Structure formats: C-alpha cells, structure tokens
Amino acid sequence: RRAKLGMGYLPQEASIFRGLSVQDNILSILELWEPSKSNQKQKLDALLQEFSISHLRTSSALSLSGGERRRVEIARCLASEPEYILLDEPFAGIDPVAVGEIRDIVSALKDRGIGVLITDHNVRETLKIVDRAYILNEGRLLKSGTPDEVIQDGNVRRVYLGEDFHVS
C-alpha cells in the first residue's frame, strides 16, 4: 500500500533478502511494477550501474559488506519509482567509507527530485546532507530549520547537541 502511494522505506536493520542474489533482490520488486521482461532487464541494469554494484550482480546477499548491502537496498527501493523515501538510520552499521557513499547517494536522490526523509541519531552526518532538520526532544519538536539554524540554537545545543558540537 505504501509503495502504491509513492513512498519507499529503508529500515535501519538489514532488509535485504538474504537467500537471493543482488539481481534477484532488485528483480523481486521490478517484477511487481514492470510487466515487460525487457524493461525489467533495462531497469535492473540501470540500477546496478547507478549504484556501482554491477560486479555484484550474481553475488549472494549474504556476502555483501554493510555499504554494498545498503546500496542494494536503496536500488531495490528505487525499483518501485517512489516519490519519497524514508531512511531510518541510514548511517547505522556501516564503515566510514560507506558513510560517504550513502551521503552521495542521498544527495543524488534529492537531485532526482525524490523527497528524502531521514531519521537518524548520527546528527553530524545527517546535518551535512539535509535541507531542513527537525530536532525532537521527549516527543516534542524542539527546533526546526536549516542545519545552520538548528546548530546555532541555544536550546538545541544545551539539550541535544552539546555546547562543543560542530559539523566538520
């Protein structure tokens, strides 16, 4: 139902289909959305190339690194051509190199016109890529605004970020 409304979702925990290859993970969604086998193949090839995972096409999902797994999950999510994607803790459980890759992928999604909503405790990485931020405290909105507005807010620094917080 969510996908039919144009919403993609990537949970924090691994959502890859472990018993499938990389290409079969993506095809599992394409087959639901694209009736033409030739169009499925074209879209599969495009997604594999876009996310630099073509060389992993026949690899088992179990053999992937955290960053590779995340790229496959994002490619699979895009197979349904969502208008918006909710990313739950996209920076959790991945190595520092993969953090940069995920940041680049999120920027590319924004450039494609896909709305991206991120929930993450890794504020430093998240504030580097968002246009607007919303800081919640005890279930209430503490501050919303641009990353700079949020970082400079005294209450946010006192309650959540800490006085010495900076984005480097």
Identify what each model region corresponds to.
Residues I85-E89:
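Catalytic Walker B motif of ABC-type/P-loop ATPase nucleotide-binding domains
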Residues E81:
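Conserved catalytic motifs of ABC-family nucleotide-binding domains
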Residues I74:
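Hydrophobic anchor residue at the start of the ABC signature
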